[in-house]
């Protein structure tokens, strides 16, 4: 069941930004007459998409059983259930949270420095453009060579073009242009795929660990047809093992299985299983984050009002106490859709193609 809310001044500004963007891109939309923040559009194939703007303060996760009525909210699977229901009816949902539109970071991008860059909102807009066929620069895998990306260049790229920004990995691969095209220069980095060991996910399978595709990101305004296949093929052929750990714990592990956790709040993971890659769909995982509703400086935990943060196991007791006091709220999301494929299966498919 949808929960409606009365928009604040900030919400009205954000809704105007969404509508202005859709108008600028000439994307037809239908604005729902009763549910605030719900817009209906269609992708390039005519399939339905729902854009759902959310003011997170109206949708905290329910903690009333533990802390009483003052901590009442939506169930932990609220967004997940809406996305799953719509997916079962061939409707894609792209969630747009208020804090994603207000997020900023100072970035030294690949082409210029920018302060107060709204990376997450820019990536969401690019996701919508891609779905609706409004991407300006299309490339093919054959336009590129594959090379490892240095950490400095990777950080600049991900902090500009990836929704969650930079995260370290064991292997970083990039697509670099062979020659000038679409206003970009020979040697420009257009797409990256990074790989690493998932420590949390492998706790239950230390003797048969999987490798995670940690970041998959394309430069904003661009699309690379066949780009992911090209990067995966290069990885599978050239990296039968990965070196993980450091010091005395440094060792090699065989690359047997790859897993990709697709952000279900924004991305359409169906392409992972319906494309030529045909990854297996392993299921959905739930997700949530936390938000400070007040400035916090207690027991080593520091945060400012409105700031978003993820799990902090060392501060669990403090966080739970502050949730009970209403100074932190937990916010659910649509979770992740999980896909997997073994290296041998991928190599066989690449050889057949």
What is each model feature region?
Residues 38-43, 158, 170-193:
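Conserved beta-hairpin
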Residues 19-40, 258-263:
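A short acidic/basic microdomain associated with nuclease active sites
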Residues 35-36, 41-79, 197-201:
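Short beta-strand-loop-alpha-helix junction that forms the active-site gateway
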Residues 140-142, 147-169:
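Short, basic/aromatic recognition patches
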Residues 61-118:
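Catalytic cores of nucleic-acid endonucleases
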Residues 2, 92-96, 106-113, 127-149:
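Conserved N-terminal entry element of GNAT/NAT acetyltransferase domains
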Residues 1-31:
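Acidic-basic catalytic patches of nuclease active cores, encompassing PD-(D/E)XK
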């Amino acid at each position: 069941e949808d929960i409606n809310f009365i928009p604040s001044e900030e919400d009205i500004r954000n809704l105007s930004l969404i509508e202005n963007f859709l108008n600028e891109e000439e994307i037809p939309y239908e604005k729902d007459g009763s549910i605030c923040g719900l817009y209906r559009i269609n992708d390039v194939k005519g399939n339905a998409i729902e854009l759902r703007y959310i003011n997170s303060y109206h949708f905290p996760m329910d903690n009333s059983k533990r802390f009483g009525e003052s901590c009442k909210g939506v169930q932990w699977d609220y967004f997940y259930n809406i996305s799953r229901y719509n997916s079962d009816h061939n409707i894609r949902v792209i969630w747009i949270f208020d804090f994603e539109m207000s997020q900023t970071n100072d970035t030294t991008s690949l082409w210029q420095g920018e302060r107060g860059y709204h990376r997450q909102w820019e990536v969401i807009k690019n996701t919508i453009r891609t779905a609706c066929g409004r991407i300006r620069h299309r490339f093919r895998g054959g336009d590129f060579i594959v090379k490892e990306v240095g950490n400095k260049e990777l950080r600049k790229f991900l902090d500009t073009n990836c929704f969650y920004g930079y995260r370290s990995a064991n292997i970083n691969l990039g697509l670099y242009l062979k020659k000038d095209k679409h206003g970009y220069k020979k040697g420009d980095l257009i797409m990256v795929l990074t790989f690493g060991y998932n420590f949390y996910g492998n706790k239950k399978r230390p003797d048969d660990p999987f490798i995670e595709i940690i970041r998959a990101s394309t430069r904003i305004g661009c699309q690379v047809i066949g780009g992911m296949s090209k990067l995966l093929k290069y990885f599978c052929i050239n990296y039968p093992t990965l070196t993980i750990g450091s010091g005395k714990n440094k060792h090699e592990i065989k690359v047997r299985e790859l897993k990709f956790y697709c952000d279900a709040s924004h991305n359409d993971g169906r392409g992972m299983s319906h494309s030529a890659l045909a990854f297996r769909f392993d299921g959905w995982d739930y997700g949530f984050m936390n938000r400070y509703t007040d400035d916090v400086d207690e027991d080593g935990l520091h945060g400012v009002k409105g700031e978003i943060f993820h799990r902090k196991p060392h501060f669990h007791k403090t966080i739970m106490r502050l949730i009970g006091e209403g100074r932190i709220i937990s916010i659910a999301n649509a979770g992740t859709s999980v896909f997997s494929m073994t290296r041998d299966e991928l190599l066989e498919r690449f050889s057949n193609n």
